[in-house]
Design a protein with these regions (language model features):
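N-terminal secretory signal peptides that target proteins for export/translocation
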Residues: 1-9
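N-terminal secretory/targeting leader peptides
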Residues: 16-17, 34-123, 131-333
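Bacterial N-terminal signal peptides
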Residues: 14-25
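Hydrophobic, aromatic-enriched, well-ordered structural segments
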Residues: 10-14, 29
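Residue-level detector of alpha-helical hydrophobic segments embedded in or interacting with membranes
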Residues: 3, 24-25, 110
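Sec/Tat signal peptide C-region and signal peptidase I cleavage site
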Residues: 26-33
Length: 333
């Protein structure tokens, strides 16, 4: 007569069988695919878009499509201030941001926004890949944003509806600035009337006379076609603010260490791609706007401009920690 196993013995057999299958890897369910939403203010073919698309591609490849990222280019998910808030809430998972809009949220971002701080692009990259980047990453994490890598954003210069050769020429002109107290004070120190506006409103505001000018790098001036309505570009190169490739802290906290390492590596690789693309695009953009008849005013002596920035430094680098960071950056070789 066949003896049926008792209930405890049947449970034991089932557990042993399950363990055996687990050893063979036969019962391991695949991890659920993650769908990430990303924000970018620029078009997909802009250097930042190229960098972000490289980032998402590398992550997909190294996770076997377990982490799938979709970047919404051209500010489809809102303007930058809105996108920052969405990332802090966790409704945007990753993004490329300019650091200036963080000036009122993350104190160390004020340092890299300070005018005439960097000698050249190489100096800026050494600073942001070193002490400045470390300080900013800590401050950003405190507000819910995890910095993974740093992108170039070029030297920012003035473009206006009439010629500007000296600070005196700016007096009384309405110049668009980013939403940042530092930028407002910077432009006011130059004698202009700072006008905070979303980036997406600059073209129509120039066209209608709401503002007399703005400031940005060559690729932004060209890609947005601002050169059609502001025909003078003065190479003040007053600022060289880097940008951050970041993820939401809420999303980051749900990742294991292996996936975090994949994202960090992918971000660094994407930054190298973005920086190469940026250097190439700067040259092309300058050639395009020059060919379109823009008057380029070369500012070779920036001393009269930088001399006006003392009150800005006194206000935004007065804190001992920030003053020390400014010194570190200036001493970098």
């Amino acid at each position: 007569m066949m003896i049926k196993p008792t209930r405890p013995r049947r449970a034991l057999f089932a557990a042993v069988a399950a363990a055996a299958l687990g050893v063979l890897g036969l019962t391991a369910a695949p991890a659920a695919a993650q769908e990430w939403r990303g924000w970018n203010i620029h078009a997909a073919d802009y250097p930042n878009g190229v960098g972000m698309d490289a980032f998402t591609r590398i992550v997909a490849e190294r996770t076997n499509n377990r982490i799938r990222m979709r970047t919404f280019h051209s500010a489809q998910l809102g303007q930058q201030d809105e996108a920052i808030q969405q990332m802090r809430l966790g409704t945007i998972d990753f993004a490329n941001f300019n650091l200036s809009p963080f000036n009122n949220l993350a104190p160390s971002t004020n340092v890299v926004t300070l005018p005439f701080l960097f000698r050249d692009v190489g100096h800026m990259q050494r600073a942001i890949d070193g002490p400045a980047g470390e300080a900013i990453a800590r401050d950003l994490e405190n507000i819910g944003i995890i910095a993974l890598a740093w992108y170039d954003a070029g030297a920012r210069s003035l473009y206006t509806t009439r010629a500007v050769r000296t600070p005196a020429d700016l007096r009384g002109m309405k110049i668009r600035v980013q939403t940042s107290d530092l930028w407002i004070d910077l432009m006011r120190a130059l004698g202009a009337n700072p006008t905070p506006l979303p980036f997406g409103e600059v073209f129509t505001s120039l066209q209608s006379g709401v503002i007399d000018g703005a400031e940005n790098n060559w690729p932004s001036y060209e890609s947005t076609r601002h050169f059609e309505v502001a025909r003078f570009y003065s190479t003040t190169e007053h600022s060289n603010v880097p940008e951050v490739l970041a993820v939401s802290r809420q999303r980051w906290q749900r990742l294991n260490e292996a996936d975090r390492a994949i994202l960090r590596d992918a971000a660094r690789e994407s930054a190298a791609i973005q920086r190469r693309s940026w250097a190439e695009r700067e040259q092309v953009s300058r050639q395009r706007v020059t060919a379109a008849g823009v008057t380029v005013i070369e500012i070779t002596d920036r001393a009269p401009w930088s001399a006006l920035m003392e009150p800005v430094y006194a206000k935004y680098a007065a804190d001992a920690r920030l003053a020390a960071l400014v010194r570190q950056i200036r001493e970098l070789r």
